[in-house]
């Protein structure tokens, strides 16, 4: 299991209370297809839409991953900066 998959799984678990059916389907389908970047993007969008906080430690790990990820073409880092923490 990759570090990115583990991070995505932890983010999904932390954000699960704010998922609707479409979010849940999208996130877990993308994870199973190996599209963690897209799953993380959907998780952050759901968290922002519902104003749901994410644990600070987990958000720090996401920011560290984003700092080295070449795949931020949809503004994920900007959206992540707006997420509330617990």
Language-model-detected regions and their locations in the chain:
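C-terminal-biased regions
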Residues: 1-86
């Amino acid at each position: 299991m990759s570090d990115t998959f583990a991070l995505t799984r932890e983010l999904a678990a932390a954000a699960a209370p704010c998922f609707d059916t479409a979010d849940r389907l999208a996130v877990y389908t993308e994870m199973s297809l190996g599209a963690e970047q897209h799953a993380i993007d959907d998780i952050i969008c759901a968290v922002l839409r519902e104003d749901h906080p994410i644990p600070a430690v987990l958000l720090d790990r996401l920011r560290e991953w984003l700092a080295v990820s070449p795949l931020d073409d949809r503004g994920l880092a900007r959206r992540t900066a707006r997420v509330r923490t617990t």
